[in-house]
């Protein structure tokens, strides 16, 4: 071999190695539970995620997205924590509501604000503020909402019709709610035992939200129970509880058609309303849902609790820009967020999707 080729060989080999490395696809990993967080049937998470991957890969040649299948929601937190301990966590991951504080406090998630500031395609004003706040900590955004589920007031329409009571409007108040519950809670067969009830499962948490207040300060350092809005919320919850005369109600009581009102997640309404799931839940009465009743304080309203599944990026990802693009594809595009409604049991956190015809 000539002296020239001996000198050039290392550079040629290096060039070949670089070309081979460049031709290999970048592989991103996404983590998600395969079943419903809200424990309802009919969710198609694989259909949803596979569609997102197909869209993302079509727009990003030489990038592949992989995932571990079969992780049930009850095992998801343990699985994800274990992957972090092994240094093998996914680049992009679904974050359960109860896990967000843990991951943000341990600096496990990458801050998203730098990506959003440089990305003209993302407009945070397009999200519902409450859903967006679920992924924020100390003024910084660490996750974006994937889907959210509000709490609604379910109504036994059959029972109201039997009692000649019209369905309340969506702007109803505590006073109307209490009056109806008081009217509906009674002994229907004359045996001296109350067997029909106005409401089941309405407690202090629902009352606090309706009155526009919370139990603790935003920093979690102070209990606010001694403030007037909190006091009136607790008092109202106590009055509602006392209406049932100490009777221990259950899901079965509602399913039997003996309760007029019950707060439930919108995901349950969506999943159980269609046939055949509907007959598994309640076959002897018609039901519907409306907004929760408004509290009496100045900050009160027809507000409800909101449960939000989020998407975040690992702090240790080696592909932060591509991970952001994948997260954005799922959480911020109209195409994928429309599929939240068709394939999952929640609603989109984007105004333009949820409020579209």
Regions found by a protein language model. Give the residues of each.
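Hinge/lid segment of periplasmic solute-binding proteins
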Residues: 97-152, 286-291
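Short, solvent-exposed loop/beta-turn-alpha elements that line the ligand-binding surface or hinge
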Residues: 113-127, 170, 189, 197, ...
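Extracytoplasmic/periplasmic solute-binding protein
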Residues: 137-146, 151, 175-223, 261
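Conserved N-terminal structural module of periplasmic/extracytoplasmic solute-binding proteins
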Residues: 1-102
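Extracytoplasmic/periplasmic substrate-recognition and gating elements
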Residues: 32, 242, 279-353
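Glycine-centered hinge/linker elements that transmit conformational signals in sensory
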Residues: 180-181, 219-249, 292
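Short helix-initiation/N-cap motifs at beta->coil->alpha
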Residues: 69-79, 172-178, 246-256
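Paired acidic/hydrophobic, glycine-rich loop segments that form the ligand-binding mouth/hinge
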Residues: 91-94, 260-265, 270-272
């Amino acid at each position: 071999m000539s002296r020239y080729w001996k000198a050039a060989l290392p550079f040629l080999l290096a060039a070949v190695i670089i070309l081979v490395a460049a031709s290999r696809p970048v592989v991103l990993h996404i983590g998600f539970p395969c079943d419903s967080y809200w424990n309802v049937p009919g969710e198609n998470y694989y259909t949803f995620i596979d569609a997102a991957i197909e869209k993302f890969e079509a727009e990003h040649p030489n990038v592949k997205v992989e995932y571990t299948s079969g992780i049930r929601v009850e095992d998801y937190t343990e699985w994800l924590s274990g992957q972090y301990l092994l240094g093998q966590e996914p680049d992009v991951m679904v974050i359960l509501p109860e896990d967000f504080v843990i991951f943000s406090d341990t600096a496990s998630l990458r801050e998203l604000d730098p990506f959003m500031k440089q990305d003209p395609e993302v407009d945070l004003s397009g999200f519902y503020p409450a859903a967006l706040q679920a992924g924020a900590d100390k003024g910084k955004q660490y996750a974006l909402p994937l889907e959210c589920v509000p709490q609604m007031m379910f109504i036994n329409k059959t029972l109201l019709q039997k009692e000649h009571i019209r369905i309340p409007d969506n702007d109803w108040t505590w006073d109307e709610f209490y009056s109806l519950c008081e009217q509906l809670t009674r002994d229907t067969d004359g045996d001296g035992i109350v067997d029909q009830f106005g409401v089941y499962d309405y407690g202090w948490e629902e009352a606090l939200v309706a009155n526009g207040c919370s139990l603790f300060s935003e920093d979690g350092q102070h209990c606010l129970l001694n403030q007037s809005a909190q006091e009136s919320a607790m008092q109202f919850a106590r009055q509602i509880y006392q209406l049932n005369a100490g009777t221990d109600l259950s899901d079965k009581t509602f399913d039997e058609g003996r309760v007029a009102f019950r707060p439930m997640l919108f995901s349950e309404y969506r999943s159980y309303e269609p046939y055949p799931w509907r007959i598994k839940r309640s076959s002897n009465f018609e039901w519907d849902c409306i907004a929760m009743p408004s509290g009496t304080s100045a900050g009160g309203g027809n507000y409800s609790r909101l449960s939000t599944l989020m998407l975040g990026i690992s702090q240790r990802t080696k592909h932060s820009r591509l991970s952001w693009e994948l997260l954005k594809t799922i959480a911020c595009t109209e195409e994928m967020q429309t599929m939240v409604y068709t394939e999952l049991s929640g609603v989109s956190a984007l105004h333009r999707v949820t409020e579209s015809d």
